[in-house]
C-alpha cells in the first residue's frame, strides 16, 4: 500500500504541533505551497548526556521529516568547544555527538532520511569563514552580545573570552551556508534565528522560517530559586529549564527505570496546578505525541482507571482536582519508561558509550 500524501493543511498542522512559535506561519504556508523541496535543520551542541527535554525537538525533527522536509542534523562540535562544553575536550565532544545520534535513531527518527553534517567539515571551507565575517559586519556588537543567550549564557558573560562573540555569527552562517528554508530550535535559539532573518535581508540571503519548540521545565518546576527582578525571559527560561548541569533537575535517556521512577515521584507537581508543572509538560510534549491516548490507572475506590484521548482534556481534569498528583506521576513514569526502553537497550549493547557516559558524567559543564 502506498504512502498517504498529506495536504498542505495536514503538513502545516503536523509541523506546528507542540511548537512554542513559528515565525511566520504565513511564510511557512507559502513555502509549503511552492511545491519546492524544502530544506530544514537543527544544530545541536554535543555537550553532555541526552536529557528528555531534547526529545521535544527530536520529535519535531521526526514530524518535519514526515511532513516532507529535507532535514539536516548539524553536529556542532566546534560550537560546543567554543562554549567550553565537556572541558573543551574535542574528542569527548565528538563521542557525545555519536551518542546523541544513536539516541535520536532509537527514539524512532529515520536517520537514513537525515543529512547528518559535522561542523568539522564546514569550518574547513574558506567560504564559510568569509560568510562569518560578512554576517558579523551586518550585525552590531550589542546585537551579538544580546544573542549570547543562545549558548545558555547571559550577555554580561561575553567577557569570558572573545571566541564567544563569534558563536552567534557562526550559527547564522551555518543557516546561510546550508541554504536553508527552515531553522528548528528551542525557544532559547530565538535570538539567533531573528538575527539570521534580519541579516538575510541585508545580505540578500534566503530568509528562514524559524520553528521554536518549548523548553521543558526542570523537575523543580516553578520553584525559581535564582530568578531576580528585571531578568529577561530568556534568562528566566535558562534558570528553570531542565539542564544537564543540574542532574537532579533532569531525566536522562540512559537513566535506569528505577531512577526515572524516583525522579518523577520526587518532582514538583502541586495538586490542581498546571503552570511550570514538569509532570504535565512531560505528558504534553513527550508522551501524548507518541500515544493515541493515556490511561491513568487508579484503584476502584478512587474512581478507577480513566482514559484521555488528548492532553487538553487531561490538563483540564487535573486542574479541577479530579486526578491526584501521585496517580499522574505513576502513569508518567510508566509511559516515559516505555519510550526510553529501546534507547537504553541500544546504549547498553555498545560498551564504548558506557565508557563515554562515565567520562561525560564527570565532565559536564554549564
Curated annotation (Swiss-Prot):
It is found in: Cytoplasm. It is an enzyme of class 6 (ligase). The keyword Ligase applies. Its EC number is 6.1.1.1. It catalyses: tRNA(Tyr) + L-tyrosine + ATP = L-tyrosyl-tRNA(Tyr) + AMP + diphosphate + H(+). One of its GO terms (cellular component) is cytoplasm. One of its GO terms (molecular function) is ATP binding. ATP binds at residue 244. Keywords: Aminoacyl-tRNA synthetase, ATP-binding, Cytoplasm, Ligase, Nucleotide-binding, Protein biosynthesis. The keyword Kinase does not apply. A motif ('KMSKS' region) lies at residues 241-245. L-tyrosine binds at residues 41, 167, 171, 174, 189. InterPro entries: aa-tRNA-synth_Ic, Rossmann-like_a/b/a_fold, Tyr-tRNA-ligase, Tyr-tRNA-ligase_4, Tyr-tRNA-ligase_arc/euk-type, Tyr-tRNA_synthase. Belongs to the class-I aminoacyl-tRNA synthetase family. TyrS type 4 subfamily. Catalyzes the attachment of tyrosine to tRNA(Tyr) in a two-step reaction: tyrosine is first activated by ATP to form Tyr-AMP and then transferred to the acceptor end of tRNA(Tyr). PANTHER family: TYROSINE--TRNA LIGASE, CYTOPLASMIC (PTHR46264:SF4), TYROSINE-TRNA LIGASE (PTHR46264). This is Tyrosine--tRNA ligase. The lineage of its organism: Archaea, Thermoproteota, Thermoprotei, Sulfolobales, Sulfolobaceae. The gene is tyrS.
Amino acid at each position: 500500500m502506498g504512502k498517504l500524501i498529506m495536504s498542505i493543511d495536514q503538513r502545516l498542522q503536523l509541523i506546528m504541533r507542540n511548537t512554542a512559535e513559528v515565525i511566520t506561519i504565513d511564510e511557512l504556508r507559502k513555502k509549503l505551497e511552492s511545491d519546492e523541496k524544502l530544506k530544514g535543520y537543527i544544530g545541536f551542541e554535543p555537550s553532555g548526556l541526552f536529557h528528555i527535554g531534547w526529545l521535544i525537538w527530536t520529535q519535531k525533527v521526526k514530524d518535519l521529516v514526515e511532513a516532507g522536509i529535507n532535514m539536516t542534523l548539524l553536529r556542532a562540535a566546534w560550537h560546543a568547544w567554543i562554549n567550553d562544553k565537556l572541558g573543551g575536550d574535542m574528542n569527548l565532544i565528538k563521542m557525545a555527538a555519536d551518542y546523541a545520534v544513536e539516541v535520536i535513531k532509537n527514539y524512532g527518527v529515520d536517520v537514513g532520511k537525515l543529512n547528518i553534517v559535522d561542523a568539522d567539515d564546514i569550518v574547513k571551507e574558506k567560504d564559510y569563514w568569509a560568510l562569518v565575517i560578512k554576517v558579523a559586519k551586518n550585525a552590531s556588537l550589542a546585537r551579538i552580545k544580546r544573542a549570547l543567550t543562545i549558548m545558555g549564557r547571559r550577555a554580561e558573560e561575553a567577557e569570558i573570552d572573545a571566541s564567544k562573540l563569534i558563536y552567534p555569527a557562526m550559527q547564522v552562517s551555518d543557516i546561510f551556508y546550508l541554504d536553508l528554508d527552515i531553522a528548528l530550535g528551542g525557544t532559547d535559539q530565538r535570538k539567533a534565528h531573528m538575527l539570521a532573518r534580519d541579516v538575510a535581508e541585508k545580505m540578500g540571503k534566503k530568509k528562514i522560517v524559524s520553528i521554536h519548540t518549548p523548553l521543558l521545565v526542570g523537575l523543580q518546576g516553578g520553584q525559581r530559586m535564582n530568578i531576580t527582578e528585571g531578568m529577561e525571559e530568556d534568562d528566566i527560561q535558562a534558570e528553570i529549564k531542565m539542564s544537564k548541569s543540574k542532574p537532579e533537575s533532569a531525566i536522562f535517556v540512559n537513566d535506569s527505570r528505577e531512577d526515572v521512577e524516583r525522579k518523577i515521584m520526587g518532582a514538583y507537581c502541586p495538586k490542581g496546578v498546571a503552570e511550570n508543572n514538569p509532570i504535565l509538560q512531560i505528558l504534553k510534549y513527550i508522551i501524548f505525541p507518541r500515544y493515541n491516548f493515556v490511561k491513568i490507572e487508579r484503584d476502584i475506590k478512587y474512581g478507577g482507571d480513566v482514559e484521555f484521548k488528548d492532553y487538553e482534556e487531561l490538563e483540564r481534569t487535573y486542574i479541577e482536582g479530579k486526578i491526584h498528583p501521585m496517580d499522574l506521576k505513576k502513569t508518567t513514569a510508566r509511559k516515559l519508561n516505555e519510550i526510553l526502553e529501546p534507547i537504553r537497550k541500544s546504549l547498553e549493547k555498545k560498551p564504548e558509550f558506557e565508557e563515554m557516559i562515565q567520562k561525560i558524567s564527570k565532565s559536564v559543564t554549564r
